[in-house]
Amino acid sequence: MRTLWMALCVLARLWPGALAGCADAGRCCPGRDPACFASGWRQDRVYGTCFCDQACRLTGDCCFDYARACPARPCIVGEWSPWSGCASQCRPTARVRRRAVQQEPQNGGEPCPALEERAGCLEYATPQGEDCGHAFVPAFITTSAFNKERTRQAASPHWTTSTEDAGYCMEFKTESLTHHCALENRPLTRWMQYLREGYTVCVDCQPPAMNSVSLRCSGDGLDSDGNQTLHWQAIGNPRCQGTWKKVRRVEQCSCPAVHSFIFI
């Protein structure tokens, strides 16, 4: 039987008209389509009605040439667009970036990945250019990885070269947090999963989160004696929030990457 099957395959290559299949019928159909069939040899070596729809891989009744006539093609997407600006000024909100589909998946090819990503952000200037955003009492934080992309002078025209590097690091010991942090699994908010009660975390204060006059970050707890309970909130999911207490101020953060954050 195997010899017969190999002979049929060779015959199909040398004399395509000898065997009907998906190519001869001009059929390649997505999903399950009972009307997408031809007459010829099937891949299970049975002659008769064979199918050229995507579901035939599961049912085992594909035409012998399905893989060649209907190759799987993966979804292809373009590059990410630049990040948008914050949706609004002077309060925690979100920015977004998108990418477009250049080729839809075909014949069971790899499906398209996410076409949109959102990340938390906070604008520190009104449309009129007035300073804002520093009046928030809680400390708004995000992962320190975001600091690599943040443009330090974007929010305020008052920054000078001498104040650009006036940053500092605050160490806190987390006291409590909501269960919503552990539920985050989106690519840009997955860092919230690593927030834990009782751990010491580092939060970097750098422009533009740093006020250009006071050289302080809102919610830094610098005036706390260490016994005061302070509040924090994760940018990107307002339900991920909690409390911590100040440990100390240091010049450079030295916490592990998963416990390193920045003020926003």
From Swiss-Prot:
**Which GO cellular component terms are attached?**
extracellular region
Q: Which residues are glycosylated?
A: N227
Where does this one sit in the cell? Secreted, Extracellular space, Extracellular matrix
User: What are the protein's UniProt keywords?
Assistant: Disulfide bond, Extracellular matrix, Glycoprotein, Secreted, Signal
Q: Which residues form the TSP type-1 domain?
A: 74-127
The record's section on InterPro entries has: SBSPO (IPR039942), SBSPON_C (IPR056801), Somatomedin_B-like_dom_sf (IPR036024), Somatomedin_B_dom (IPR001212), TSP1_rpt (IPR000884), TSP1_rpt_sf (IPR036383), TSP1_spondin_dom (IPR044004)
**Disulfide pattern:** C28-C36, C28-C52, C36-C70, C50-C52, C50-C63, C56-C62, C63-C70
Entry superkingdom: Eukaryota
Q: What is its main location?
A: secreted
Pfam families from the xrefs?
Answer: SBSPON_C (PF25031), TSP1_spondin (PF19028)
Domain SMB residue range list: 24-75
Question: Hey, what's the signal peptide range on this chain?
Answer: 1-20
Task: Give the similarity note.
Answer: Belongs to the thrombospondin family.
Q: What is this protein called?
A: Somatomedin-B and thrombospondin type-1 domain-containing protein
- Please tell me the species this chain comes from: Bos taurus
